[in-house]
């Protein structure tokens, strides 16, 4: 029989010895015991139930020995305060993307000041961006597009769990929207942006869908696709918001000037101080 402290210490050391993140095993402990972090801290000297210790040990071994993301083991990731189901069919939502959602909400308040607006999340994956916006702002009517049937199913399940009333289209980037001749006030997207030949963490490369990772030879393929046709699906007064690679600031600025020469736009840094988002406003 082990205490919470002993089990956590073993798991952290086991993870670190294999060059894995020790913080991840705490998430597994919270998941298995259905406890919050502060509850585990309060119970550190208490004995773990045998069944929970066995399950925790099993999951730690899978995480460390087989390099399976903890989010896949738990079946979810927390994003903007809500649980989103994830699988190997979708990109695991990142903390940086929460900042994109927050900045879209701020820009919406500045530009539309509480008006009813139509929003589209292009290439939604798990639905984290679009569904978070729908849940946060009642005046946003949200549509989500996704090319992958498997990813779309995950997003639809998340919408059901969150009781979010949204519309889904399956298709590549803007194509289903163009086919339906739809118009929107806000377009938001976090498309695949890793260049094809770039070396990336094997843990990411081996566990996340390449369809959601790679953005062509220079990582800008999908931004070009979206910006080329964006004016066809947007009302004259609009917001376009992208997440992108930290080193794509100047390339994104050039694309914006090419397709929206009259727009005002700004590149925003994430909490790590990296250029991560470009917000475009047409008024």
PLM region descriptions:
Residues 31-32, 107, 136, 259:
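Alpha-helical structural context
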Residues 1, 50-53, 91-95, 216-220, ...:
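Short, solvent-exposed loop/helix junctions and linker helices
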Residues 11, 100-104, 108, 226, ...:
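Generic hydrophobic alpha-helical segments
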Residues 44, 54-138, 142, 147-157, ...:
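SAM-dependent Rossmann-like transferase core, predominantly class I methyltransferases
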Residues 1-74:
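N-terminal auxiliary segments of SAM/dcSAM-dependent transferases
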Residues 21-22, 112-116, 181, 235-236:
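Short helix-terminating capping/connector loops at secondary-structure junctions
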Residues 139-282:
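S-adenosylmethionine
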């Amino acid at each position: 029989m082990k205490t919470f402290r002993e089990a956590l210490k073993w798991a952290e050391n086991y993870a670190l010895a294999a060059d894995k993140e020790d913080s991840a095993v705490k998430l597994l402990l919270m998941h298995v015991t259905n406890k919050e972090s502060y509850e585990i801290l309060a119970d550190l000297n208490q004995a773990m139930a045998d069944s929970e210790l066995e399950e925790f040990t099993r999951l730690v071994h899978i995480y460390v020995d087989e390099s399976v993301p903890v989010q896949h083991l738990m079946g979810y990731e927390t994003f903007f305060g809500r649980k989103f189901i994830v699988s190997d069919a979708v990109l695991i939502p990142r903390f940086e993307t929460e900042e994109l959602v927050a900045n879209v909400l701020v820009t919406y308040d500045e530009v539309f000041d509480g008006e009813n607006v139509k929003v589209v999340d292009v290439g939604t994956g798990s639905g984290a961006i679009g569904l978070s916006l729908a849940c946060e702002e009642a005046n946003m009517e949200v549509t989500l597009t996704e090319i992958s049937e498997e990813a779309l199913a995950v997003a639809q399940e998340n919408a059901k769990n969150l009781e979010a009333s949204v519309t889904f289209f399956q298709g590549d980037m803007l194509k289903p929207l163009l086919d339906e001749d739809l118009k929107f006030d806000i377009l938001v997207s976090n498309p695949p942006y890793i260049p094809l030949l770039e070396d990336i963490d094997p843990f990411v490369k081996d566990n996340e869908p390449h369809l959601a990772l790679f953005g062509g030879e220079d990582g800008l393929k999908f931004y070009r696709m979206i910006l080329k046709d964006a004016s066809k699906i947007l009302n004259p007064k609009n917001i376009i918001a992208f997440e992108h690679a930290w080193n794509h600031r100047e390339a994104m600025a050039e694309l914006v000037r090419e397709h929206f020469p009259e727009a005002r736009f700004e590149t925003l840094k994430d909490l790590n101080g990296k250029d991560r988002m470009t917000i475009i406003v047409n008024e």
